[in-house]
Amino acid sequence: MTDSTRSLRNCLAPAKLNLFLHITGRRPNGYHDLQSVFQLLNWGDTLHFTLRDDGRVARVTDVPGVPEESDLVVRAANLLKAHTGTTAGVDIEIDKCLPMGAGLGGGSSDAATTLLALNRLWQLDLSRTELQSLAVKLGADVPFFVFGKNAFAEGIGEELAEVELPTRWFLVVTPRVHVPTAEIFSDELLTRNTKPVTIADFLAQQNSDAGWPDSFGRNDMQQVVTSKYAEVAQVVKWLYNVTPARMTGSGASVFAAFQSKHEAEAAKAQLPTGWNGAVAESLNEHPLFAFAS
C-alpha cells in the first residue's frame, strides 16, 4: 500500500472464509441467529482512493452489474460523509479480484476498506467502534471486516470476539454459478436449530490438523446449496478426493486447508480444466487495521 496526503493506493480488501457456519435459531423478524468463525485471507480486491476538492464521491472504474449509486463502496463513503459532515470528496478505483456472490465477502470487504481508508485519508479519526456502528448499516459482514481480526461471530454476525488461528494456506474453488443468499436462508429444508457451541469448543478442535476442517462443525447451508446447485456439489465431491473441504458462507465457493503453499498449489494444479481456483494464505489482521483505534 502507498500512502500520501492526497491518495491511498493498493488498499487490500481481504476475502473471508467461514471455517464453520451454524444456524442456531430464527428471530421473529426473519433474521437468523448464527455462529461462525471468520478467517481473513491475504487475497481480495484492491482499492485506490484519491482526494477530490469538490466534495463529490465518485467511482471511477466500471464494475459490471453493479450501478455506481448502489455500490457498497460509494454507499460507505457517502455514509461516512453524512455522519461526519466532512466536505472532502474522493475518487475510488476498484480492481476486482474476488468473484461476486461466492460467499467470500467481496462487496462487504470493499465497503469496510473504504470506511477504514477514508477514516485515514479524510483525517476523521473515528474509533473502530464508531466505524462498526456505521458498517452494520451496510451489511451483516461489513462490521467484521472493520473489526479487522479473525473472529468468533454470534447473533446475526455482529457479536465478534477475536480468535487466534494458526497460519494455513487455502485453496478456494469457485464454481461458475451465483447462489442467492436469500434463497438459501428461506429454504424450508435449511437446518435452523443447531446446538450452540463455544469458542473453547472450537479452539480445542481446530489446533488438530487431522481432518480439518471436518474435525469441527459444519456449514448448515451446504446441504441445501449442493442439492440445488450441481456445480457446487461437483466441487465439494472433487475436493473431498484430495482433502476435507467445506463451502464458505452461502456459497458458491468451496475451500480446503493445507499446511504449505506447495501443497495448496499442487492441489490447484489438479483442478479440472475450466475450474476457477485460487491459493491464499491466512491473515491474522486486516491490512488497514491501524487506520482506526
Curated annotation (Swiss-Prot):
TM spans (from-to): none
Keywords, alphabetical: ATP-binding, Isoprene biosynthesis, Kinase, Nucleotide-binding, Transferase
A GO biological process held by the record: isopentenyl diphosphate biosynthetic process, methylerythritol 4-phosphate pathway
Pathway: Isoprenoid biosynthesis; isopentenyl diphosphate biosynthesis via DXP pathway; isopentenyl diphosphate from 1-deoxy-D-xylulose 5-phosphate: step 3/6
Active site: 16, 141
Coiled-coil ranges per UniProt: none
Protein origin, superkingdom: Bacteria
Catalytic activity: 4-CDP-2-C-methyl-D-erythritol + ATP = 4-CDP-2-C-methyl-D-erythritol 2-phosphate + ADP + H(+)
Record-listed ATP binding positions: 99-109
EC identifiers of the protein: 2.7.1.148
InterPro entries in alphabetical order: GHMP_kinase_C_dom (IPR013750), GHMP_kinase_C_sf (IPR036554), GHMP_kinase_N_dom (IPR006204), IspE (IPR004424), Ribosomal_Su5_D2-typ_SF (IPR020568), Ribsml_uS5_D2-typ_fold_subgr (IPR014721)
GO molecular function: 4-(cytidine 5'-diphospho)-2-C-methyl-D-erythritol kinase activity; ATP binding
Enzyme's top EC category: transferase
Cited NCBIfam families: ispE, PRK14608.1
HAMAP family: IspE (MF_00061)
Function: Catalyzes the phosphorylation of the position 2 hydroxy group of 4-diphosphocytidyl-2C-methyl-D-erythritol.
Family membership: Belongs to the GHMP kinase family. IspE subfamily.
Protein name: 4-diphosphocytidyl-2-C-methyl-D-erythritol kinase
The species this protein was found in: Burkholderia ambifaria (strain ATCC BAA-244 / DSM 16087 / CCUG 44356 / LMG 19182 / AMMD) (Burkholderia cepacia (strain AMMD))
The encoding gene: ispE
